[in-house]
A protein has these predicted regions:
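A compositional/biophysical signature of low hydrophobicity enriched in polar/charged and small residues
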Residues: 1-81
Length: 81
């Protein structure tokens, strides 16, 4: 399963947050991509895991612990049709 994690960073911290998220290693999930974006979020990361609980753990124990992360919103990828 995959999820997009929309990340809001502290002012002036988007670059550091993006770099920090990109360097995360977790036995629970793999970071596939990290991109800076415009709009209400600063960074969007794509994660992949074989288990929903492990994915959640990677977000709470990994991404949310990166210095400068203020808030995350997780969007699970679903198949249409």
């Amino acid at each position: 399963m995959r999820a997009y994690v929309l990340i809001e960073s502290a002012v002036g911290q988007a670059n550091a947050v993006g770099n920090g998220v990109g360097k995360l290693t977790s036995p629970n999930a793999r970071v596939i991509s990290v991109n800076a974006v415009t709009g209400p979020f600063d960074i969007i990361a794509l994660l992949e895991s074989n288990d929903l609980d492990k994915l959640g753990q990677a977000i709470t124990d990994g991404i949310q612990q990166v210095e400068g992360v203020q808030r995350t919103t997780t969007c699970l990828v679903v198949k249409l049709g």
